[in-house]
Amino acid sequence: MTILKWGLSLAVGGFLIIFGVTKFTGGAHIFPLIEMNATDLGVPFAGLFFPVVNYVTGLLELVAGALVLLPMTRKSIGAPLAVLPFLGAVVFHLSPLLGVVTPNGYAEGADGLDAALQAGSGFEPSHFTAETGPVLFILAAAFLLLSVINAYLHKQG
């Protein structure tokens, strides 16, 4: 059982840290996509999705990832906290703000993308690749399941 707990903790923690880092390096294209969809739907404060919610989510992922990897914090806070980013991802993928099928990234050489990223607004469909798929949703759902199992196993002792 110890090997299973360690394996789950390493998988969940590593995934959270890797994806948390992308929120600060510009590699996460999902938040600009959410902002664009939220603006189109008339959601108040849509401009906060990128970069504010992007950075808050990245920070949560980094903290949860670190806490789930550290043995002294894993059981008390790390494993339960690690569920939240994945739950949020699944909820957003099931909402009209994101959807299950999403673009696979930024379009290469997208006109105005750098200016839009620097301004934090003004995203357009041409900024994202035409290739779409459910990969991010499947990853979010799979890691939600793994993080819930991890939290349950650590709660049981």
Model regions: which residues?
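Membrane-interface extramembranous regions
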Residues: 1-157
